[in-house]
Amino acid sequence: MIGYYPEHCPFCGALNVNFITAEECSENYKVIETEVNDKVIRLNSSPPLGLEHSAYCIETKNQTVWIDCPSVFSKDIERMDKIMFTHHHFLGASNLYRSYYSAFLWIHEEDSKQNLAQKYSFDKKFENDYNLFDIKAYHINGHTPGFTFYIFKDIFFICDYVSVSSGNMHFNPYGPRDKTIEGAKVMNNILNKHELRKVCGFDYVLDYSDWKAKFDDLLNSLKI
């Protein structure tokens, strides 16, 4: 998929004897779509592939934009114009979508420098917050140097900055904890200026009010 064959998976550590090719992946897996609302669709690999994650498709008035990318490449999915990343851990099969659909890949400059991103081609490496087709991008650092979250109208895209399990919320442990916490505080100040209804995470979609209550509890626990 990315032009070279590492000795082991950088995420789970599996040896390359257990790898499958991009062609085998496309033959045995597909991308399924689940509606979040009339403008946003959740994208997942089916059956779940490896450390499975969700990407999201946004239908703006101007273009079709993805937030992050599925691990499976499919020629059956509708064309996207851009794929904008929260961070470099969720590049998925984006280079194949870029080649087949001529999709433009956008990522923060700092994450484009990371080892996992070195074999990918990016069309725009942004450094500042921006607003494109009503999609607002906010760089907060933290979990990764270039971590960026997105807001489209009343939908908030957070990826895996925090996880939710057994009713509790936790910060992503992979990354500098102090910077992750500082990024969360910056994010909280931004969120408090928006009216939001849904949160789209790497493996969940939640009502914003429920998610925010857990997020507030997490931030408050830092003060104890």
Residue ranges of model-derived segments:
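Metallo-beta-lactamase
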Residues: 1-8, 15-18, 64-65, 103, ...
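Active-site HxH/HxHxD metal-binding segment of metal-dependent hydrolases
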Residues: 52, 70-133, 217-220
